[in-house]
A protein has these predicted regions:
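Face-selective signature of the C-terminal outer-membrane beta-barrel domain
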Residues: 1-108, 122, 184, 243
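Residue-level signature of outer-membrane beta-barrel architecture
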Residues: 32-34, 88, 102, 111, ...
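Flexible, surface-exposed loop regions and adjacent strand-edge segments
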Residues: 6-8, 13-22, 59-67, 114-118, ...
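Outer-membrane beta-barrel channels and translocator barrels
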Residues: 33-39, 91-95, 122-126, 166, ...
């Protein structure tokens, strides 16, 4: 929630903008873990999220004029997701992690199935290398689906949008400095597709900065992210624990 006020030459205040925005999520989640052997474990999970959204935005067209509603949105939907992943010790030094993730948006029955796999190599007692690949998807913010404006004829024009999708590739290097200290370096690249964009425009939800989206969008955008995360961790000893991390990111 928020608002803005203007002051005239006599320092009298008049409201310029009023925003009432509410998001509420009800979440149920459960996981089941099973260790079949020292080299084989499995994890299964399920999450149900019921989401509620309400937004009213009013703006004064001119100074000292009464506020007028320019955008409204209200609705609810559910996101259902489930996954199954396994960790298999192929040898003493090689570990395979593989799984599958799926989700369904009940608003428009859009769904996705996403495989994910990773391979880890214990090169030395202190050094590990890993390579991972996965497909990921996400729904947009609730206002994208439910906001109504005068320019759209007070209709929600984006209810049929599909998920934004991405393919992630990540490398990982881990070094055990001592029994209490660990260093991890993780470079990655992400290729995004099916990004909601405005047709015949440079607008993309990847760089949105507005309170709401008022135009029809299509899943035809692309993006690319590349970055690196570096983490130094000192484990708990004598009541002291700390972590130092840094990131570089380009989109």
């Amino acid at each position: 929630d928020g608002g803005a006020t203007l002051f005239n030459h006599s320092m009298e205040s008049t409201p310029y903008m009023d925003l009432d925005s509410k998001y509420t999520n009800l979440i149920f989640t459960t996981t089941f873990n099973r260790k079949f052997s020292n080299r084989f474990t499995n994890k299964t999970g399920f999450t149900y999220t019921n989401m509620f959204y309400k937004m009213d935005l009013s703006i004064a067209p001119y100074e000292a004029e009464p506020l007028e509603i320019v955008s409204q949105g209200k609705g609810n939907t559910s996101l259902i997701s489930a996954y199954n992943s396994s960790s298999v010790g192929l040898t003493e030094r090689w570990t395979l992690n593989a799984g599958i993730y799926g989700q369904l948006l009940t608003l428009n029955n859009k769904w996705s199935v996403e495989p994910r796999v990773g391979l880890k190599w214990q090169a030395t007692p202190k050094t590990t290398f890993a390579l991972a690949y996965g497909m990921y998807s996400r729904m947009e913010k609730m206002d994208v689906y439910f906001v109504k404006t005068k320019s759209t004829g007070n209709q929600s024009v984006n209810k049929d949008l599909d998920f934004t999708k991405a393919q992630h590739i990540m490398l990982s290097f881990g070094y055990k400095i001592s029994d209490r200290m660990n260093l991890k370096i993780e470079p990655y690249i992400q290729f995004l597709h099916d990004v909601p964009v405005m047709a015949d425009s440079s607008y993309s939800v990847l760089n949105r900065s507005d309170f709401y989206v008022e135009d029809a969008l299509v899943n035809k955008g692309r993006g690319r992210n590349v970055g690196i995360d570096i983490t130094f961790e000192r484990f708990l000893e004598k009541g002291l624990y700390y972590m130092i991390s840094g990131s570089w990111f380009d989109s």
